[in-house]
Amino acid sequence: MPKRQDIQKILVIGSGPIVIGQAAEFDYAGTQACQALKEEGYEVVLVNSNPATIMTDPTVADRVYIEPLQAEFVARIIRKERPDALLATLGGQTGLNLAVELDRLGVLAEYGVELLGTKLTAIEEAEDRDLFRKLMFKLGHGVPESEIVHTVEEAEQFCAKIGLPIIIRPAYTLGGTGGGIAETMDEFIRIVEGGLKASPATQVLLEKSIAGMKEVEFEVMRDATNQAIIVCAMENFDPVGVHTGDSIVFAPTQTLSDRDYQMMRNVSLDIIRVLGIEGGCNIQFALDPVSFTYYVIEVNPRVSRSSALASKATGYPIAKLAAKIAVGYALSELKNPITETSFASFEPALDYVVAKIPRWPFDKFESADRTLGTQMKATGEVMAMGRTMEEALLKAVRSLEIGQADLHMNRFAEMNEADLHRHIIKATDERLFALYAGIERGHTVEQLHEWTSIDRLFLEKLHHIHRIEQDIVKHGLTPERLRHAKRYGFSDQMLARITQQTETAIRQIRNESGLHPVYKMVDTCAAEFASDTPYYYGTYEVENEAVPTTRPSILVLGSGPIRIGQGVEFDYATVHSIQAIREAGYEAIIVNNNPETVSTDFSISDRLYFEPLTTEDVLEVIRNEQPIGVIVQFGGQTAINLAESLEAEGVKILGTSLEDLDRAEDRKQFEAALTQLDIPQPPGKTAVTVTEATAAASELGYPVLVRPSYVLGGRAMEIVYGEQELEHYMKHAVIASPERPVLVDRYLTGMELEVDAICDGTDVVIPGIMEHIERAGIHSGDSIGVYPPQRVPQAIKELIVDYTTRIAKAFRIKGLLNIQFVFADGELYVLEVNPRASRTVPFISKVTGLPVARLATNVILGDTLASYGLTSGVLPEEKLVSVKVPVFSFAKLKEVDPSLGPEMKSTGEVIGTDRTLEKALYKGLIASGMAIPEHGRVLLTVADQDKQEMLDLAKRFTALGFTLLATAGTASVLEEHGLRVQVVGKLGSEQGSMLEWIEKAEVEYVINTMSRDSQVTKDGFIIRRAAAENNVVCLTSLDTAEALLRVIESLSFEASAIQPFDYMKKAVAR
């Protein structure tokens, strides 16, 4: 079937901000889809709310709207643009839910907009739990015994009938939001209540637990002619019961018999055909390992996280081909872009093993419940490829950047047997390491299988790694054993641990024996067809397929897995850098290990190496490619942290020199440089011991801001109010050393400001100054950022330009730098300087129209800013106001405190742009998922130091018609100032406690600020968690509350009584 000629303009819906369950994979899918549609000559209009993505670049679509993904806003775009068709299946769950809502509201019918690809009936049959179950029965496919319920009472009746454990799956949610496995009645009621609240349809599926069965996923494609293929079959290391996004996954499947595989393949093809899905689809199965019984767990009728993994694992570009199928093409008409000779109707074949390991945020949230279940908790993932399962797994482990070079974790090695047993049987982010510790202690594969239900083959592979390790311990590292260990993925660092040598010593042994990896091509066809797509992975074999070209090349280091503090913003900068390198005539090489991102799309760079971002792995790529230099500025802290070890091995770092990177990162050198420049900075000191830290704090005066050096995202950063707190921080939160001391600064409260700047050694260009709504003390990544600044005097703007220019030149910056300031007590202070791309680069690029990362790359390559018509200073301010609003995933992470502070907690961001600050804020807050009721109840529970400031906010809420709720202490303060308050009970009150109000969602807003009193702090945590779990807006900063008030005031009409006539009084007076 040829492409459709009856449509010209297509609206593509993106997936919005990065949240747990919906990450960068949709930036990759959406970008591919837009490019595919433009290739075919269609006019493409894109709507998405996320400024941090390549997808929202102006070049990706013909017109890009960065607007809230709400029916109200998308309907406006449809009215304005009048598209012929809508493509929603590349926008994740957000895109699907929005398409369903637009259809329900009649918007699509009113404007004659056709839904491309998968039809609404198929979406509803796959997403609606009841319809899906009925379809599976009709087709004769197994589904677990289950029932759809809409109330807790219905749920209790089903539980009484089949008994516990029960799996709870809410309908139309993302990443298992609101779901879980209930082992007890209390758990069951709690999860059902949460699931009903989380589901837009107030519908949950209760099913008899099949936890412990083998979990398998099939990625399937179908076109309108009913051709269908399996792109990739993947097998989870963890049995059913752990969300697939939280599971270690292998591709191709490793433990299935051919009969099992063919059975589920046929079922997958049957399901996609009956549903009539046109494009990509993900089907999840539970398989009984001892019989041929299977159950269909769920069908995702869209491109998903697994699609991105399958695309990168096989090289088959699912999203691109799904977009082409949506406009009428058949699989047999589409060429496979990797081979360019075979067609997309050929099923991919793999001659290597792929391992995916999730990246969890528990290093940021140590209080979080680390148990893994049906509700996803990972923020990102890594992927690795090898010729053996062991190699792929070990490469993936060292890609995680969690301080683990291999499977041996000291904490588990030193643990007592009972505690280790608990860590083995319980699914957590660390169970893989606990299993290895069990093997080190002599537990058999059979024992571990009995305890965990993990397939024996997977456990045998862990056992094999341990046997290789023990062989080296007993017999030494001979050349044969070295080669054997390398073939199974042992890194130099791992071998250094085993042999008690240094990593450098192992590298030297390897270099002397000429032992290096070769690079194999990912070609979708196991070398059946000729392919020259430069997409490689390293392995220890004989033939090297990555033959370097003669053109001069530059290597860019990616930023690794998505995590809090280092998100998709860094991938955005990396992609722009690669594009600039290619445009400058160099060959662009990238090393990265994240399957979700645009940077690991093989069509972006000239050569893609899917490898761990470690010194060893990067050096081997450099040895093979011999680039003229390496760029580390765009890969976040991951890349910056590799600069020193690479330069020590003779690698040329392009851009800002290592010496100058160190001067900015090293506290003493940084302070000395600012003192020499006569630029104010908060008084501060460094400390290596508890004594040094307490002495520094006493001298500076409490409160102090403490943090480790060389970190990103405010990792382990805290505001400390007393000596006891500081001692606890030094003993538990950080490991200080002379090379990496703890920084102790006086804590300044004031307005925080931020700039990104580009320096070529002569000129310093600042695209724009960003102002933070929240005062200093809340991490910049968690603050609402405003451009252009609204409250900053002209004299301070000029001072920011002056300080930035002088710092950039003094630190000999070549490329990008980011500076954070605080304006406190009439003085402008420099808080920190980052000599690299920051997370605000995509935002400032989009709101100013200056491609910051691309321009910085051109400067690194030798261009001057003057050659682009740019001179030193800040660009003229834009007329529209833009706000960057952080997005959090607190509902997914139980036990995490939703209060904001100096350690970053947001997973993503959205943008709001309009003519006034209030309108921009409204769009930004709505886009972030916040509901903004214009009347109702506000619960005020604030710390004593905030009560005076709270009064003004309380008066303004009252003027808008809100009812104020407060506990007795806060209520008395409000009543003293003439405000009417409804008194509510404290936590633990027998009736009418504030917790009841929140749990029943009978308040619209909770304003809660942190107290230093330990009991009050504990109560505050319970209040904030209750708000997060019941979808009640909770604000922990009065600055954010004031911004919200401005928005509500701008939406509200004044309701004033008319004035009495006074001319009669005047006449009488005369």
Swiss-Prot record:
Give residues annotated as binding Mn(2+) 3: Q820, E832
Gene Ontology terms describing biological process? 'de novo' UMP biosynthetic process; glutamine metabolic process; L-arginine biosynthetic process
Amino-acid positions noted as binding ATP 2 in the UniProt annotation, renumbered to this chain:
R707, R746, L748, E752, G777, I778, H779, S780, Q820, E832
Please provide, in alphabetical order, the Gene Ontology terms of the cellular component aspect for this entry.
cytoplasm
Q: Where is this region: Carbamoyl phosphate synthetic domain?
A: 547-929
Allosteric domain: annotated segments = 930-1070
Q: Does the keyword Magnesium apply?
A: yes
Q: Domain named ATP-grasp: which ranges? A: 133-327, 671-861
Hey, which pathway is this one from?
Amino-acid biosynthesis; L-arginine biosynthesis; carbamoyl phosphate from bicarbonate: step 1/1; Pyrimidine metabolism; UMP biosynthesis via de novo pathway; (S)-dihydroorotate from bicarbonate: step 1/3
* Keyword Repeat appears in the UniProt entry: yes
**Which residues take part in binding Mn(2+) 1?**
Q284, E298
Instruction: Tell me the protein family, please.
Output: Belongs to the CarB family.
What is its quaternary makeup? Composed of two chains; the small (or glutamine) chain promotes the hydrolysis of glutamine to ammonia, which is used by the large (or ammonia) chain to synthesize carbamoyl phosphate. Tetramer of heterodimers (alpha,beta)4.
Q: What is this protein called?
A: Carbamoyl phosphate synthase large chain
Annotated gene:
carB
